[in-house]
């Protein structure tokens, strides 16, 4: 793979009904219904809305044989009205259900974490090598007959690993690690190869974007070592709704798409399924528009590890670089100096003149030729102002430069000025590649100047900015290159929206936390309560608890597993019943839905993590996720 130049990974083609995946085909878009699968009319109506929005596959939960058999009626209902969309059965816990679903769906998703292995209980299990091999044989004995049914019915298979539902067997041997998630997938892929079953798609998902990106990168590497080229389904599970869901999905999925990985995507939002499709389409179109871009002659830093990157070593300059949290720069060139009370930038670029009224706690950046050393202000230079930079005594300087202007003279100047922070600019169609090239070149030259990434847009909707900026920053964050972010938008968006997007990107990348984080699933036919209204009520009660992670899950498939990554969890336990978690420990079961939010607040209070709401938002409490 080329870090600096975009091209899609070559994969094998998989036939899924009349809509093939992988190979020369475009990146496919899909979603999943959240209606009960036995309700034929509701499923057909929702599937049509997904297709009308641009969805190319529709997935339905099939928790039992009756649901699997009803896929036939749903198929008939769609085909009879001209909708030929392939249906995907989503199966957990029951190989028998997968066998039945393979006769009616164009593709069946199985979860290695609960296909043969019992559901996750977080118990540490001890196996000898012989006992472990016997467990693998159990999988083969049950999986091969399923593959034979799929061959007979021309049904494709997705092997879908979820971070939240790894088996106790895998966890006991590999721990809660990317290596364990990859091996969980590879156990099944090796059987597919042995049985010459090639209509296979794979996915490895997590709500933690860092884990998701690292694991998919590792999976591709392991597959290449074993001569496999199966196509990838990408997604961030439990991404949430609104701004959070869009940014988190764009960051995780976009980072992988930018490296040419991914043949189909699902943006999992806790909203109506058809709302996912336009977001996914924008993301795919934005990434693939850079095909055949002008070549970027980048040089990879010798110590860079793509599979397990660490933060680039930089010299701290005041509160930038080193071990400091990444900073947020913002623009106020239009003279409007308002800031979001919860998301106040660390530095504001004011251009030619300092504003009459300044924000407390904010530093200001002025053009170097007008900077006079005023308190809390710092000079900004461009790559043509090196002589002026040489004579400036400021203890913090900002040097704006694109990669192609990183000449020997600029490098020499930076070596003489470790107090200079580089602001990387790019107008290249593949700005991810060009930003990467600049950061790598600094390391190649032995420079430890911090790097802030300047991203220039002209968007009129928050969603467009969230998708594009998230996708552009994802790989840079996960590669450990980001010491700061500077979003500049010339569209109709307010500064508050732009600033909130910048902070949201850093939080989604788990490098700076400034608000409550919600891990919420999109819901499916297993969800027996109104997920969207519940999320709204939980947010209303807890959105001021900055730095806290709260999971809101529709059912137990991933719920308990994802709770290990949350401080508190709200998980569906049956019709109208909720279970509450403190991390992965279930504290109280089967609470009536109408009492559950109040009980959640009581649990948070009992553990000393609750603060009463104040009339105005205070500065964000920030912490770095390790």
UniProtKB/Swiss-Prot annotation:
Pathway: Isoprenoid biosynthesis; isopentenyl diphosphate biosynthesis via DXP pathway; isopentenyl diphosphate from 1-deoxy-D-xylulose 5-phosphate: step 5/6. It catalyses: (2E)-4-hydroxy-3-methylbut-2-enyl diphosphate + oxidized [flavodoxin] + H2O + 2 H(+) = 2-C-methyl-D-erythritol 2,4-cyclic diphosphate + reduced [flavodoxin]. One of its GO terms (molecular function) is 4-hydroxy-3-methylbut-2-enyl-diphosphate synthase activity (flavodoxin). Coiled coil: none annotated. Its cofactor is [4Fe-4S] cluster. The keyword Iron applies. [4Fe-4S] cluster binds at residues 521, 524, 555, 562. Binds 1 [4Fe-4S] cluster. It is an enzyme of class 1 (oxidoreductase). InterPro entries: Dihydropteroate_synth-like_sf, IspG_atypical, IspG_bac-typ, NO2/SO3_Rdtase_4Fe4S_sf. Keywords: 4Fe-4S, Iron, Iron-sulfur, Isoprene biosynthesis, Metal-binding, Oxidoreductase. Disulfide bonds: none annotated. Its EC number is 1.17.7.3. GO terms for biological process: isopentenyl diphosphate biosynthetic process, methylerythritol 4-phosphate pathway; terpenoid biosynthetic process. Pfam families: GcpE. Converts 2C-methyl-D-erythritol 2,4-cyclodiphosphate (ME-2,4cPP) into 1-hydroxy-2-methyl-2-(E)-butenyl 4-diphosphate. HAMAP family: IspG. Belongs to the IspG family. NCBIfam families: ispG_gcpE, PRK02048.1. This is 4-hydroxy-3-methylbut-2-en-1-yl diphosphate synthase (flavodoxin). It comes from Bacteroides fragilis (strain YCH46). The gene is ispG.
């Amino acid at each position: 793979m080329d870090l600096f130049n975009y091209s899609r990974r070559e994969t094998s083609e998989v036939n899924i009904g009349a809509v093939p995946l992988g190979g020369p085909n475009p990146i496919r878009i899909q979603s999943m219904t959240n209606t009960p699968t036995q309700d034929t009319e509701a499923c057909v109506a929702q599937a049509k809305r997904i297709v009308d929005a641009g969805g190319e596959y529709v997935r339905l939960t099939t928790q039992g044989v009756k649901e699997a058999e009803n896929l036939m009626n749903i198929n008939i209902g769609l085909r009879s009205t001209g909708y030929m969309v392939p249906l995907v059965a989503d199966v957990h816990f029951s190989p028998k259900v997968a066998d039945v679903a393979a006769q009616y769906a164009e593709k069946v998703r199985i979860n290695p974490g609960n296909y043969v292995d019992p559901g996750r209980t977080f118990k540490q299990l001890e196996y000898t090598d012989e006992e472990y091999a016997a467990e693998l044989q159990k999988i083969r004995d049950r999986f091969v007959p399923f593959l034979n049914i799929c061959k007979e019915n021309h049904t494709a298979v997705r092997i879908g690993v979820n971070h939240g539902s790894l088996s106790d067997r895998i966890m006991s041997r590999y721990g809660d690690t990317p290596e364990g998630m990859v091996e969980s997938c590879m156990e099944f892929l090796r059987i597919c190869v042995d049985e010459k079953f090639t209509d296979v798609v794979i996915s490895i998902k997590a709500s933690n974007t860092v884990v998701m990106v690292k694991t998919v990168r590792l999976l591709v590497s392991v597959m290449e070592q074993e001569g496999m080229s199966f196509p990838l389904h990408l997604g961030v599970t439990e991404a949430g709704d609104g701004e959070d869901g869009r940014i988190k999905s764009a960051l995780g999925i976009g980072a992988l798409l930018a490296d040419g990985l991914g043949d189909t995507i699902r943006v999992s939002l806790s909203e109506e399924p058809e709302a996912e499709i336009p977001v996914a389409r924008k993301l795919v179109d934005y990434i693939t528009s850079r095909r055949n871009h002008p070549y970027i002659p980048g040089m990879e830093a010798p110590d860079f590890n793509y599979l397990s990157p660490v933060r680039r070593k930089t010299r701290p300059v005041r509160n930038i670089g080193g071990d400091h949290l990444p900073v947020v720069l913002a623009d106020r060139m239009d003279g409007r100096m308002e800031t979001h009370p919860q998301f106040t930038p660390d530095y504001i670029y004011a251009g030619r003149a300092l504003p009459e009224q300044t924000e407390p706690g904010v530093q200001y950046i002025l053009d170097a030729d007008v900077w006079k050393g005023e308190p809390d202000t710092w000079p900004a230079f461009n790559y043509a102002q090196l002589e002026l930079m040489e004579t400036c005594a400021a203890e913090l300087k900002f040097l704006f430069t694109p990669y192609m202007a990183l000449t020997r003279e600029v490098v020499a100047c930076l070596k003489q000025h470790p107090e200079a922070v580089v602001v990387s600019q790019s107008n290249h169609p593949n700005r991810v590649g060009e930003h990467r090239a600049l950061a790598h070149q600094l390391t190649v030259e032995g420079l430890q100047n911090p790097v802030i990434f300047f991203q220039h847009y002209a968007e009129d909707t928050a969603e467009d900015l969230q998708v594009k900026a998230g996708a552009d920053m994802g790989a840079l964050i996960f590669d450990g290159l980001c010491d700061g972010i500077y979003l500049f938008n010339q569209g109709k968006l307010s500064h508050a929206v732009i600033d909130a997007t910048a902070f949201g990107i850093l939080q989604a990348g788990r490098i700076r936390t400034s608000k409550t984080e919600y891990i919420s699933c999109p819901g499916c036919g297993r969800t027996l309560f109104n997920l969207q209204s519940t999320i709204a009520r939980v947010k209303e009660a807890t959105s001021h608890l900055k730095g806290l992670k709260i999971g809101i899950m529709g059912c137990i498939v991933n719920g308990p597993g994802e709770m290990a990554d949350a401080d508190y969890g709200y998980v569906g336990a049956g019709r109208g019943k909720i279970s509450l978690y403190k991390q992965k420990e279930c504290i109280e079961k089967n609470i009536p839905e109408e009492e559950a939010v109040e009980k959640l607040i009581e649990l948070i209070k009992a553990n000393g993590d609750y603060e009463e709401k104040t009339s105005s938002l205070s500065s964000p409490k920030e912490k770095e996720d390790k």
